[in-house]
Amino acid sequence: YTALNTLSLHDALPIYCLPSYSFGGHDVFGAIPQFTKLYGHTVAIIGGETALSKAMPHIQPVLDKAGINVLDVIPFGGECTFARGKEIAAMDSVKDADFLFAVGGGKAIDTVKVVAVELDDKPFFTIPTIASTCAATSEAAAVYTADHNFDGIAFVNHPPVHCFIDADILVEAPSRYLWAGMGDTIAKHYETLMSARNREQVYNTQLGLVLSSMCSEPILEHGLQAYKDNEIKHRSEAFDLMVMTVIFTTGIVSGCMPGDYNSIIAHAVCYGCATNEETEKHHLHGEMVAYGLLILFIVDKQLDELNRWLPIYREIGWPTKLSQMGLDESYIPQIVEKAVSVRDVVVSPYEITTDMLAEAIRYMETIEC
């Protein structure tokens, strides 16, 4: 695997590939043959069961008309694990397919990335059905154990060949996914800036750092309205903008930045919170990252940013306290021990310690929100 703790193509030769996408309503799937024709005429489709039920009625007629043969439709299994990726990759229908479709949210799409790596970078296309992460346009896969503990980050050597974004499907999804997706996306701006601080920048990282502001400012201005519109299933300009911000803008930034520059304290704290089984089960990744961003602000002494964001946190309901994620202060040692053990904190302008994180979490508990 081209994982963060092993040598990969990124170590030997920096290659930066930006994602491509089509955006629209159900009509977006009409573009499928245009982008798949270079790769063959057989596909294995892998995704979440709910996601497949939402997307396949719109995808299948296009595939039939184009003469693209579906060799198999496979539920991904509910968690992105190396074991499940290997299991799917060993299926004859998947090995025989010319290319893969990844349908669903981040865990389903990341599972297909693991499958693609197993099959020597088999081409894959993404069809996100929730706007909760940039998984559909990025090279990174967040991999977990079967019991839902964070296991590591794996990289494919390129982003998906193409991403088909159907906003008509996305607006029908529960609003909590966009809500969490925006929380995850805001952190991209601040985490890349912090990771890259005091380091010599090349063109790609400069581009990524400039673009990263588009991961935060549009959400500050339009995020609450988009969330409200999503709650009533109204596809508005604000909703479409947030979909593109979460799925695509963040993917571009990820593609520009070296892997270790893409996350730091916010994600590390998220993984610490997720060590609690009930928290991981009942709270979304982006929700916990949003909380972790507040801890980043405190640790990094960005109190002006903390105060700038707290009002929208209150309005939109992102967590500001441990209790909102089913935790209390007795769990702080577990959170911070996990946080400092992950690769996310390795590239930092200064050493991140357990004491530093614990103090910031306790300080956040004292703030009236």
PLM region spans:
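A glycine/threonine-rich phosphate-anchoring loop and its flanking beta-alpha core
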Residues: 20, 118-211
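C-terminal charged capping/lid subdomain of soluble metabolic enzymes
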Residues: 302-369
